[in-house]
């Protein structure tokens, strides 16, 4: 042990060289520079870094070798153990503070970007587009602008109310879809719903003319066949009408030459009682005419020349004027012949009795029997009809009278109610 102490003391003396014998200790710890990753690892690492420290020197003593020998020597390992905790705590605290500062700096660098983006979107008054407007009116302008856009979208997507009506009725001049006939080749007929009243009146007048034209022809044929003297009737009427238009004096002058002709008729022919009866009122009429002639001659003298001319024309055609009774008979015959003509027109209206089967509507029943379905539509519009046409039961009977044009003039229901066609094409409901 003594040899070891001597060697150490000799080596210590060589190092001192007469300089200051105070112990030399480092004033600042040397910290190794590490990266950010290394610093982050240092936060979680619990191991102690071993640092090389200088050995503690002993002060040189002169003459007291015994005391030096007797003093206990503290090994360097113990010194290291005592000094390490102090040095290590300071380094770890500095490392932790440095890492915290760097992490906080990075977080602070990211936060301003997010904070800068939020105010731009949340504050429209700071938008560059709205810099023209005052700052206090920018929010109001944006609210009004958004409301206008929403209204435009709403009205653009709103469906039109005419879509349903366009499918049911395409045009005002056409028959609705539900009332069109299945046979497309059949021409469309005019109804009160499709045409104005003026056109309906023209159609009714034409129909009446077409109905009465054949009646007049038949009546003319019957009269010409029965009476061959009908050709002379216009001349007789002209001769009879001319005295009525002239003054009473001219009428008296025309009746005077008729007397010999009428007196000759019973002599030439066999005396017949009706002829005598017809002549007697004419004689009585002559007396009244003579009295009127006398009064007229006193009042109007210059009219004699015209009376003579009329008398001459009446005397030249005594044969035509000699048969006034036959003309009256012919007129009566024409009236009698006109009655069966009206019966024939009534017979032209064909009547049908239709039975409503189960599950079939009146419109389908008309369609099956080749009737005009537009008449059903017109009947449904009659005042007071209500739901009569849609409340049929299976087995109900309907009597329909149709004219020569195929239109329904009258329809009688099983309960006694009737639908009567009017001149304008509409129907009247009668219970």
UniProtKB/Swiss-Prot annotation:
Q: Which InterPro entries match?
A: LysM_Opacity-associatedA, OapA_N
> Would the keyword Mitochondrion turn up in this protein's UniProt record?
no
**Consequences of knocking out this gene:** Loss of the ability to colonize the nasopharynx of infant rats.
Annotated region (Disordered), positions in chain: 1-98
In which compartments does the protein localize?
Secreted
- Is Lyase among this UniProt entry's keywords? no
Where is there biased composition of kind Polar residues?
Answer: 1-14, 86-95
Q: Its principal location?
A: secreted
Q: What induces it?
A: Undergoes phase variation.
Please give the Gene Ontology molecular function terms for this protein. metalloendopeptidase activity; peptidoglycan binding
Q: Which UniProt keywords apply?
A: Secreted, Virulence
Listed GO CC annotations? extracellular region
Homology family: Belongs to the OapA family.
User: What does the function comment of this entry state?
Assistant: Cell envelope protein involved in phase variation, confers opaque colony phenotype.
Q: What is this protein called?
A: Opacity-associated protein OapA
Originating organism: Haemophilus influenzae (strain ATCC 51907 / DSM 11121 / KW20 / Rd)
Q: What is the lineage of its organism?
A: Bacteria, Pseudomonadati, Pseudomonadota, Gammaproteobacteria, Pasteurellales
Originating gene: oapA
